[in-house]
Amino acid sequence: MPLTISLIFAGACALLNLWLAYRCVRIRVNGPGGVGDLGIPVLRARMRAHANFVEYTPFVLILMALLEYAGGSVEVLEGAGIVYFLARVLHAFGIERPRFTMQLIGAVGTWTVLLALAIWAIWTALHDAMLIVR
């Protein structure tokens, strides 16, 4: 059984990860070069956006793949993937703005999707276990 939805969002997230990394590299190449944030506030913000993406994305993608494999609703998984992806884009742009509205929306969107997927995964596992016991 191909995990079509998970594969689509894994690919999309890989591209987003490359874009987030590129935003950091572009500043280094056009600036003094080197490692770390170089004392440049925009670079520091972009590095945090990239690192934050890398911190959350594996959990979301693993949960999506497992839920899809377990027969979870394709429509709900698509919705979760879209919300997560858009939340991460908002977070990436919002983190370098003086007013953190987009960053906050992105963070809340990320947490909401991760929490929903985690609860859904636990419920699915317990529900399936109860069916096996009966």
Q: What are the residue ranges of the model-derived segments?
A:
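Alpha-helical transmembrane segments
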Residues: 2-19
